[in-house]
Amino acid sequence: NTAEELLFDPDIIYSKLNKKALDVLVRSGALDGLIDSRFSGMKHFWSAVVVDRPKKEKRLNENIELYRPEGDFTVEERIANKANLTGVFPMDLVLNKNVKDKLEEYLVPPIAEFDSDLQVVWFVPREIIKRRTKSGKEYWIVNVIDSTSNQTTIRCWGVRERDTIHINRPYMCKIDYDEQWGFSSRSIRHNWRLLG
């Protein structure tokens, strides 16, 4: 199968396979099998076939040359595309086998399987929301996900200016749990560890 067969087949009803449908199929990875040696990567294919959708084969060839520098989607873009379009977080793109083996070796559970005696878990931050307390101190609400696909919130207290949390990267953390407030953590610098 080729891009030409998909785009210019007389048997396909193109009002059904419109630009939006093609966009979702390409960015979710469903059409990876159509990317051949003419394309420098998935982003190049997406730009040439979807963004500037050709009506004729000649225009497709022009697009292939025009968008050649696009290359491939970054890892961050691929994670965002798969998570947003399929609703499933691509843990395989974030957590490599070495890190996964180490977590299992040290018996560190995902946050959904929190153990109050151990108080150490791993997760992947998806979003950081910055807030202020009544007294004006900054704290963060971090939305996280783990291998069980459970999304959870962690409140980070005592945030300092130099503290950083990378989105879509695995972390191990010492956290507390309260029935009323849920998960919380103090001192990102001391209690959070970036894995891999």
Question: Language-model segments: what does each one mean?
Answer:
Residues 123, 166-190:
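Flexible glycine-rich surface loops and low-complexity tracts that mediate binding to linear polymers
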Residues 131-135, 146, 178:
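Acidic surface patches and DE-rich sequence motifs
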Residues 87, 121, 143:
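Conserved, well-structured core segments
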Residues 119-121, 140, 171:
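Hydrophobic core residues within well-ordered beta-strands of beta-rich domains
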Residues 116-134:
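Structural detector for short beta-strands of small beta-barrel domains
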Residues 136-138, 182:
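Short acidic/glycine-enriched loop/turn segments that link adjacent beta-strands
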Residues 1-116, 155, 181-196:
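Sliding clamp-binding short linear motifs
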Residues 139-143, 147-166:
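Beta-strand/loop nucleic-acid-binding surfaces
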